[in-house]
Amino acid sequence: MAFLALGINHKTASVDVRERVAFTPEQLVDALQQLCRLTSSREAAILSTCNRSELYIEQDHLSADAVLQWLADYHRLSLDELRASAYVHEEHEAVKHMMRVASGLDSLVLGEPQILGQMKSAYAVAREAGTVGPLLGRLFQATFSAAKQVRTDTAIGENPVSVAFAAVSLAKQIFADLGRSQALLIGAGETITLVARHLHEQGVRRIVVANRTLERASILAEQFGAHAVLLADIPQELANSDIVISSTASQLPILGKGAVESALKQRRHKPIFMVDIAVPRDIETEVGELDDVYLYTVDDLHDVVAENLKSRQGAAQAAEELVSVGAEDFMLRLRELAAVDVLRAYRQQSERLRDEELQKALRLLANGGNPEDVLAQLARGLTNKLLHAPSVQLKKLSAEGRLDALAMAQELFALNEGSTDKSPQ
């Protein structure tokens, strides 16, 4: 086996380079087939996300330079430019790297779960392209198992490490069933987009996006089946909102105490969960003084994120140990599998010799031969034939002074000095 894992990621390459080395979903099947054809790779898979583009390859002989040249040519980059950002892992280190990636240990956000799904998609596309064989098939399954064990046996994925996810996690603590809740999101930037995605994934009943311009609110709302309104419509929406999360660039507060008091009266003081992620603040601090309002600021969330990141870093050490064990186990099984073909051929050869001697013995018995003599001849003949080829090779190795091979043969046949018969002196 000659196995390679190579590519670029957020730690080694700028966004500009990552964009140029990324593969679109439509390119992948053709790229995989071309990669195998032009680089003498027997098996290949490509993982391409916003933070990394990696190639997993099995070859007869390691040829990282040829693969890097292909990658540079495919994306019309200079080889020197690509080489400056690329990393190459071989054999055991390549297996370990692949398992670390799938477990979220190499991610921009430590322990993020999306990468495992992306790895599974890479495997599915490679199977579709016909570039997955015995090695990658086994390796992907071992990788998925290792990542699952990391998720199950460590706390690396349990605590949110983004402000958006932390906000949604706090909402889940207050509302046991988000599927019965309505959310009002104020703003339409990157953070609110992440909040909308997390809420949508949690099955929130209804999402309303309020923004200064209806066009931007509508673009975001369409992604998650939400409803778009203007900032001026917030008072009407507030009374129906169980969750309010705001993140705008406004220099003045958007929500005041009076508007929230009015909404609470209409809600008959049913609680409202509010998160103000904006700096400067979108929600007046006095709103937090109201009964039935749970108001959190960006600083509150940063404390949660920092504590959770510390927890994840502690869990990462245990996860690294699990990945190391998983990689070692895979390499051990792979080395054991390497003997399967040899053992199969040796068994077939032995069975052929056995059948030849057995047929000879049956003919002798049919012609009236003495059974004891026939059995003795069968045993001698089979022993001689089984030992013939090894004997010839051992004599040849001895004549060549290959003492290492002789020692290996002694170990192979479980021989030692005390096990051989010695003639009387």
Swiss-Prot record:
* UniProt keyword annotation of NADP present: yes
Q: Its catalytic activity?
A: (S)-4-amino-5-oxopentanoate + tRNA(Glu) + NADP(+) = L-glutamyl-tRNA(Glu) + NADPH + H(+)
Q: Which residues bind substrate?
A: 49-52, 107, 112-114, 118
GO MF terms here are:
glutamyl-tRNA reductase activity; NADP binding
What broad class of enzyme is this? oxidoreductase
Q: In which pathway does it act?
A: Porphyrin-containing compound metabolism; protoporphyrin-IX biosynthesis; 5-aminolevulinate from L-glutamyl-tRNA(Glu): step 1/2
Q: What keywords were assigned to this record?
A: NADP, Oxidoreductase, Porphyrin biosynthesis
Catalytic activity, EC: 1.2.1.70
Q: Which positions does UniProt annotate for NADP(+) binding?
A: 187-192
Other comment? During catalysis, the active site Cys acts as a nucleophile attacking the alpha-carbonyl group of tRNA-bound glutamate with the formation of a thioester intermediate between enzyme and glutamate, and the concomitant release of tRNA(Glu). The thioester intermediate is finally reduced by direct hydride transfer from NADPH, to form the product GSA.
> What is this protein for, i.e. what is its function?
Catalyzes the NADPH-dependent reduction of glutamyl-tRNA(Glu) to glutamate 1-semialdehyde (GSA).
The UniProt similarity line reads: Belongs to the glutamyl-tRNA reductase family.
On assembly, the entry states:
Homodimer.
Q: Name it.
A: Glutamyl-tRNA reductase
Name the species this protein comes from.
Pseudomonas putida (strain ATCC 700007 / DSM 6899 / JCM 31910 / BCRC 17059 / LMG 24140 / F1)
The taxonomy runs: Bacteria, Pseudomonadati, Pseudomonadota, Gammaproteobacteria, Pseudomonadales
